Amino acid sequence: MTSGTSRGPENESTSPGLPGSADKDLAGHADRVRRGYLLVSGLDYFADMLLTVTSVLLLQSLGMGSGAVFALIAAVWIVEGVSEIPTGVLADLLGRRASVAISFVLRAIGYSALFFSGNVYVAAAGVLLSALGGTFASGALEAWAVDETGAKDPSGLDRLFAQGKIAENAGLVLGTLTGAALGTLDLALPQIVAGLTCALAAVLSLRLMTGRRDPDRPPAAPEPQAAFAPRLRESFGEVMTGTRLTLRGDKVLIALILAAALLWLFRGIPGVQWTVVYEGLVGGNLLVLGAMRSVGSLLEIPLLGWTLSLQKRRASARRTVIVTASTAGALALVCAAAVKEPALSIVCYVCFSTAFGLCMPGVRAAMNERIDSGHRATVLSVASLFNSLFTGGGLILTGLAVGDLGSTALAWPLAAAGFGIAGLWVASLAVRPGTAPTTTTSTTGSTGPQEVRAP
């Protein structure tokens, strides 16, 4: 594929001072992109985490039973899953900035619906609309940051995603504590604040997500509005073909996607139950629940800084971090389900959630190393598709087997075993070099991808 920067003679200069100036401009642009990525990521998590303590309690207060809550959360994951590929195509077709802005607008509407309506069906529709909105940003923001910063090497990717995780954790902590505090006044109040935050984030994403022309994609020729639908179908076919060829040419990438999906599944099961499990243990105090949810994310910030410095010194450190974190997380979740002392159980659960957060930057960096830039957003959406379908299906099975959101005797030990095994699998793949050969397509048509370069 061609690069996103024209290399013709008319764009080159013989001035000896220009290369250094150009390097400074590129470095300054990368810094601006990184700051924009961190700010938008932080706002994204702040808005979502405003609801982490109160959302299930709000749905129950509207008359939704435990089984229905389990089914609704599973439906959220499934909606996200089936929407991932179409919205990934739109991200590549319409532009990643527009896709992220659409995501925030849809979530602003969905979150606000839960505030303005006391009807359980309207509330459920708002939850599903918010889930749909989330898929527009899935992969698009990440792909934009990787391409615009030029972070292609392992150390650059690890640094970008570690910093992104820190920004996400900052948003998570602030959002969780703010939502818990607002929830003590009214369970619906965090919803409207989340909606307003998403509206603000939509404006900021349009202002901040600027930069050079998308890499590996020539400028689109102007076309009439009526041609949009054919272009969408054509783009969908091209990207799906490119994704299929990329995955077929890189078995390690396929395995990474599947293993990461298992990590999300086994993190998702206790993630649904924790509010109900610990509400009685803390006497229904939402601020305590918010603090409990935030402690793990606060711990991640210095730990991520330490793991980043370790990875700079040792190339194999990524695997060490994932193995250690997944093993410790699995043991912690078993202890959280088994121990009778509430305080100890809370500490163990916090350790489990922290371990998951430490695994993810390395997993995301390993995937991005192996994805061709031209279809990065869509391939990342394919990964999110597997995450969503695995987790949604797993939650349905868990709901049928457990039946009660507050029961951990069966679900948490099984989730712990799966989490540990998936972590070891991911770790075995995360430091393998991308060696898949370049894959070309036949030239029988002009609409298919001309080349899919294996990273």
PLM-predicted stretches and their roles:
Residues E80-G118:
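Conserved MFS/SLC helix-loop-helix module at the cytosolic interface between two early adjacent transmembrane helices
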Residues L189-R207, A411-S428:
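Symmetry-related core transmembrane helices of the 12-TM Major Facilitator Superfamily/SLC fold
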Residues V105-N119, T327-K340:
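C-terminal ends and interior cores of transmembrane alpha-helices
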Residues E10, T14-R34, L208-I257, E451-A454:
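Juxtamembrane intracellular "pre-TM" segments in multi-pass secondary transporters
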Residues G20-G81, G249-S297:
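Helix-loop boundary and gating motifs at the non-cytosolic
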Residues T2-P9, F70, G81-D92, R97, ...:
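C-terminal transmembrane bundle of multi-pass solute transporters/carriers
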Residues V127-N169:
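Cytoplasmic helix-loop-helix junction between adjacent transmembrane helices
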Residues G42, G110, Y121-A137, L344-L358:
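Hydrophobic core of transmembrane alpha-helices in multi-pass small-molecule transporters
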